Amino acid sequence: MVVGIHRPSKLVINAEAIRNNVKNEISRLDGHSELFAVVKANGYGHGIVETAQFTKQAGATGFCVAILDEALALRDAGLTETILVLGITDVKYAKLAAENDISLTVGDQAWLDEATQILNQKPLKVHLGIDTGMGRIGFQDGASFKKAADYLEQSQQFNFEGVFTHFATADEKDTTYFNLQVERFNHFISQLTRRPRYVHVSNTATSLWHAACNGNMIRFGVGIYGMNPSGKTLESPFDLQPAMSLESELSFSKLVQKGRSISYGATYTAEEDEWIGTIPIGYADGYERRLQGFHVLIDGQFCEIVGRICMDQMMVRLPKSYPVGTKVILAGKSGEKSITMTDIAEYAGTINYEITCGFTQRLPRIYTENGVVN
C-alpha cells in the first residue's frame, strides 16, 4: 500500500465530531442499553483503529465489524472490548476467534455442529442471526432457531452471547415492512427459554427513528461519522456532525482558448476562453468518474468539474485565475458554502457511506482535534 503523502490531496477526519456523534446518541439511550460502534470497512473509510479509539473515549462499550480480520486488527491494536463479527466466518476459524475473545455470528445449525469438532478449551462467543426479511444471512424459521438456541444452552463449547436481526427499511418513511420484521423478530425471541446477554436489532437508522425497538444494545454505524442513513429523506433527531472532509490544492492552472477540449473523450469543449485548474486526485483515489459535472469549492465558490475524471487527476472550470497551491474542498466547507457526502452521493446516484467507503488508501487520513492536527 502506497499512501500519497507527497501531494496535497488528503482526507481530514475530525475526531471531536466522531466523539460528539456517539455521545449524543448515548444520551438518548435508556440506562440498560449499550452502544457498539460499527467500525467495519476501515471505519467507513475513516480508519478502523482510530475510529474505534475515538468511539471508546465517547462511551462505546463494544465494536461491530464485518470480517474476522477486522476484529483481529482491533485486538492487535490493544482494544479489549467485546467485538462482534456481523458476517458469517468460515467455521475453520472458530478456534482462532475463541482464542482472541471475538464473538461470531451464526446462521445455521450445521455451522455449530462443525465448530463443535474444532473447539476445545476456550468457549466461543456466538450471536444467532435471524433473517426476518433482509434476505441475507440468519435463521429463517422458528424451529431451527430454537434448536440452535437450545443447543447453545447445553454446550460447554459455546457462550450464547446474543441474538439479533437487521432491518431492510429502517431509513424509509413507509414503516410497513419494518413493522413486519419487528413482529417476526418478536416471534423468534418468544421461543427462547433464556435471553442471552445481548438482544439487538438497531442499526443507526433504527436507533434514530425507531428507538423503542432498541433492545439492550445498538449497532451505531453511519451515524458515528456524521452521515444521515436516509440521505435527506428523514430528519435526524439530533445534529449529526460530519467527520470527514476531502481537501486538495490546484496543481496546475491555465487559460484555455475557446474551442479547446478537456480530458479523455473530449467530452467538454470550452465555449469561451476559460481558466481551467487541475487537481491531483482521481478515480484511483475513490473520486469516481461519474462525478463529472459535479463541483468542488475554491475560495468559497462552486467550480464545475469539466471533462472526464482521470485516474489520478481531474479538471475544474475556474471563475478567474488562481495560483498553483490554491486550496480545493471536494467535501467540506469553504466560506459560507459546503459540500456534503450526501451531496456527492445524490449526484452519483448512490448513498453517502458508499462514497466514504470508496476512498482508497492512497489518500492520507489526517486526524484533527478542534482543527489542530493530532
From Swiss-Prot:
Q: Which PROSITE patterns match?
A: ALANINE_RACEMASE
Catalytic residues of the enzyme = K40 (proton acceptor), Y264 (proton acceptor)
Q: Which residues cross the membrane?
A: none
Q: Name one Pfam family in it.
A: Ala_racemase_N
Entry-linked SMART domains: Ala_racemase_C
Q: Which UniProt keywords apply?
A: Isomerase, Pyridoxal phosphate
Instruction: From the UniProt record, list the reaction(s) this protein catalyses.
Output: L-alanine = D-alanine
SUPFAM superfamilies associated with the record: Alanine racemase C-terminal domain-like, PLP-binding barrel
List GO BP terms, alphabetically. D-alanine biosynthetic process; peptidoglycan biosynthetic process
Q: Which Gene Ontology terms of cellular component type are present? A: cytosol
Which residues make up the binding site for substrate? R136, M311
> Where N6-(pyridoxal phosphate)lysine occurs along the chain?
K40
Q: Which pathway does it operate in?
A: Amino-acid biosynthesis; D-alanine biosynthesis; D-alanine from L-alanine: step 1/1
InterPro entries (UniProt xref): Ala_racemase (IPR000821), Ala_racemase/Decarboxylase_C (IPR009006), Ala_racemase_C (IPR011079), Ala_racemase_N (IPR001608), Ala_racemase_pyridoxalP-BS (IPR020622), PLP-binding_barrel (IPR029066)
E.C. designation(s): 5.1.1.1
The UniProt GO MF terms for this protein read: alanine racemase activity; pyridoxal phosphate binding
Q: Which cofactor does it need?
A: pyridoxal 5'-phosphate
Q: What does this protein do?
A: Catalyzes the interconversion of L-alanine and D-alanine. May also act on other amino acids.
Q: Which NCBIfam families match?
A: alr
Q: Which family does it belong to?
A: Belongs to the alanine racemase family.
Kindly provide the name given to this protein in its UniProt entry. Alanine racemase
Q: Which organism is it from?
A: Pediococcus pentosaceus (strain ATCC 25745 / CCUG 21536 / LMG 10740 / 183-1w)
Tell me the organism's taxonomic lineage: Bacteria, Bacillati, Bacillota, Bacilli, Lactobacillales
Encoding gene per record? alr
